[in-house]
Amino acid sequence: MSDKLIIFDTTLRDGEQSPGASMTKEEKIRIAKQLERLKVDVIEAGFAASSNGDFEAIRAIAQSVKDSRICSLARANDRDISRAAEALKPAGQFRIHTFIATSALHMEKKLRMTPDQVYEQARLAVRFARQFTDDIEFSPEDGSRSDMDFLCRVLEGVIAEGATTINLPDTVGYAVPEGYAALIRSVRERIPNSDKAIWSVHCHNDLGMAVANSLAAVKLGGARQIECTINGLGERAGNTSLEEVVMAVKTRRDYFNLDVGVDTTQIVPASKLVSQITGFVVQPNKAVVGANAFAHASGIHQDGVLKARDTYEIMRAEDVGWTANKIVLGKLSGRNAFKQRLQELGIELDSEAELNAAFTRFKELADQKAEIFDEDIVAIVSNEAQHAEGEHFRFVSLSQRSETGERPHARIVFVADGKEVTGEAEGNGPVDATLNAIESKVASGAEQLLYSVNAITTGTQAQGEVTVRLSKSGRIVNGVGTDPDIVAASAKAYLAALNKLQDKSSEKLNPQI
């Protein structure tokens, strides 16, 4: 059996299904390039048939990423598979991931198909997909709750048709480690041609066991691919956390005896990028990528670490990409120094125009705060990346008046569909007044579900990172804005969220795998 563990990242597909985590095409490309630097084996870039926006994002990623294999999800029908193949065509190497439900409940209530019909459709789908690529993954949706005999029949059939990866998902996060590993092992033992495919696992974290289930399936069940997301991003309680499974296998190689090709020094940069783009803040005590993951408050622990790091640290912070905050640039730094630092941070801008816009914003920030950190530079690029072609709203300027005992007043200037407009309003505070001023001109009718503020670096001069979550007509989106002025950051975040609400191309199907 292979001693290589394949890391299949689905941040851009299953991760994006987390309410509010929708991303623009440009944001997806940035994450895909970071995943390539992370050296993940497979990037599931989306679900091509679900929307034109997803199709275009997959195609753009297929054109941009060269070293990782690009994958698209597709239901088990010719239309979906053809659409996936078309989007993936620019990629040097690609995979089609097709699926159909196999549990009695799903077949009867959702598909309204008999087991024989599902069996036949699964086989035909894999056969059709083989016309486009030799790399086919098949998932029996709700496989962990399917009848064992029928599940084995379907999987044997799709392997015979050419499926090269079989993924057994725990769709609702119900499994426990020993039981899930036993399921994988039992299915593999019962299927005569099981050695013709790589066995994969895809776990959800509803009971907090996604990582444990995945690792048990690898160690005890013989799985050799784990499907996961950066920061465990995903709907409900999330998916298997990439950083946790990778570091578990690498740190405990004595136990797992498996190789992983991931460049672990890119884990924290990937975590920060996904967090900034989605607005989902990483909890401080999150394993590997949380702010406190390598912090020691106990005096005894601190003393031990100072004498010998391995007394209380099983991993080194620098091995996963943690670096100390350090001043890298200032107001006298030139364009070439800025460009070089972007390259050192692994940030690629597609054009001179994008570089010029980011540099202009950097100079503006340097006039506002004396010390510029790497985190500030990443935030600048993230902020500029939101200004995609065809955006509806863009922040221009803000003025406010607030005195004790009086209602604050805000006046904001922003671009709406190419035209500069000015809104004025009062509110319960400066932020409320500013958002009311935007709504006085936009009248979006959206409901605000969340408002949060996070400091990007330390100190009173730190940039504030604001996340605003809006809901309208069943759609939930996040907007993120950064600025040393928290109120200005709030306005930018609100406008970013409104832009996503206006983007109809992001409306799509969200399959449960």
Swiss-Prot record:
The keyword Transferase applies. Residues 5-268 form the Pyruvate carboxyltransferase domain. GO terms for biological process: L-leucine biosynthetic process. SUPFAM superfamilies: 2-isopropylmalate synthase LeuA, allosteric (dimerisation) domain (SSF110921), Aldolase (SSF51569). Mn(2+) binds at D14, H202, H204, N239. One of its GO terms (cellular component) is cytosol. SMART domains: LeuA_dimer. Residues 394-513 are annotated as: Regulatory domain. It is found in: Cytoplasm. It catalyses: 3-methyl-2-oxobutanoate + acetyl-CoA + H2O = (2S)-2-isopropylmalate + CoA + H(+). Keywords: Amino-acid biosynthesis, Branched-chain amino acid biosynthesis, Cytoplasm, Leucine biosynthesis, Manganese, Metal-binding, Transferase. One of its GO terms (molecular function) is manganese ion binding. Gene3D superfamilies: 1.10.238.260, 3.30.160.270, Aldolase class I. The keyword Amino-acid biosynthesis applies. Its main location: cytoplasm. Pathway: Amino-acid biosynthesis; L-leucine biosynthesis; L-leucine from 3-methyl-2-oxobutanoate: step 1/4. InterPro entries: 2-IPM_HCS-like, 2-isopropylmalate_synth_dimer, AIPM/Hcit_synth_CS, Aldolase_TIM, LeuA/HCS_post-cat, LeuA_allosteric_dom_sf, LeuA_bact_synth, PYR_CT. Its cofactor is Mn(2+). Its EC number is 2.3.3.13. Belongs to the alpha-IPM synthase/homocitrate synthase family. LeuA type 1 subfamily. PANTHER family: 2-ISOPROPYLMALATE SYNTHASE 1, CHLOROPLASTIC-RELATED, HOMOCITRATE SYNTHASE-RELATED. Catalyzes the condensation of the acetyl group of acetyl-CoA with 3-methyl-2-oxobutanoate (2-ketoisovalerate) to form 3-carboxy-3-hydroxy-4-methylpentanoate (2-isopropylmalate). Homodimer. This is 2-isopropylmalate synthase. The lineage of its organism: Bacteria, Pseudomonadati, Pseudomonadota, Betaproteobacteria, Burkholderiales.
